[in-house]
């Protein structure tokens, strides 16, 4: 894929930083076989953007590593082109710098983004105080609903699947702007380790406890039925890491 790299991806870039508060994050996301690669590129960028925003920063620059499928050169070129078009469509909104890129072939295509940000809001896990409210910027459930989709759940209609994709295509920039305006903190990105694990980290750091009520309103399309039937790929690890810190008061509601 080296010849393809030369057309689309640079090897390196020089970035001039005027702030002394620099944030960096790296994130990888595996390709959803049913999704068009343009939207997947957008989702991969926004997935990484969440880490930067939750650190109280705005995106400055990024580098990408693209895992392309084992295919003929034209197919690889297709994925490379549309992955990057999706990524660039979101980076243009951020006015962020595309610094460098790399490609490789893989049985599990995916996108890794190393993203840099400039810190504009001091937010740390130990800043929660008693009486704080927990605000979710999006409904929960992408992990287990994607698992339900992959297992052909009869409860998961095309309309619900569209809601899942549309949720992933929404940036949290507007939510971050509100947090900045009202100096809300701490912030966290709950993708990956889930709401439970991230909230436990905040509570431990702030010497507090938190109370949650799971209801249909905070899950995409109210799909609680599939929650008991399907598990996300990270479910077991997340459960094992968090279960000793959680007290379930009523399992029926």
Question: Predicted segments — roles?
Answer:
Residues 126, 137, 164-168, 188-191, ...:
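Glycine- and other small-residue-rich loops at beta-strand/loop junctions that grip anionic moieties
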Residues 113-123, 156-180:
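Active-site glycine-rich loop that binds ribose-phosphate moieties when present
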Residues 38-55, 88:
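Alpha-helical scaffold segments that flank or form the walls of functional sites
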């Amino acid at each position: 894929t080296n010849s393809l790299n030369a057309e689309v991806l640079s090897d390196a870039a020089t970035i001039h930083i005027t702030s002394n508060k620099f944030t960096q994050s790296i994130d990888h996301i595996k390709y959803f076989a049913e999704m068009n690669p343009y939207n997947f590129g957008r989702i991969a960028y926004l997935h990484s953007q969440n880490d930067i925003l939750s650190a109280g920063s705005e995106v400055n620059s990024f580098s990408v590593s693209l895992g392309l499928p084992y295919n003929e050169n034209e197919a690889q070129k297709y994925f490379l082109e549309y992955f990057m078009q999706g990524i660039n469509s979101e980076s243009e909104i951020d006015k962020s710098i595309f610094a460098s890129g790399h490609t490789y072939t893989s049985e599990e295509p995916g996108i890794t983004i190393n993203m840099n940000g400039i810190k504009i809001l001091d937010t740390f896990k130990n800043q929660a105080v008693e009486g704080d409210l927990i605000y979710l910027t999006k409904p929960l459930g992408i992990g287990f609903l994607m698992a339900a989709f992959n297992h052909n759940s009869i409860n998961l209609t095309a309309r619900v699947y569209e809601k899942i994709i549309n949720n992933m295509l929404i940036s949290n920039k507007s939510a971050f702007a509100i947090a900045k305006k009202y100096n809300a903190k701490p912030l966290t990105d709950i993708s990956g380790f889930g709401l439970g694990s991230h909230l436990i980290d905040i509570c431990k750091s702030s010497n507090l406890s938190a109370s949650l009520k799971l209801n249909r309103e905070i899950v995409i399309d109210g799909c609680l039925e599939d929650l008991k039937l399907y598990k996300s790929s990270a479910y077991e690890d997340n459960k094992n890491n968090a279960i000793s810190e959680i007290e379930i008061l009523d399992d029926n509601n």
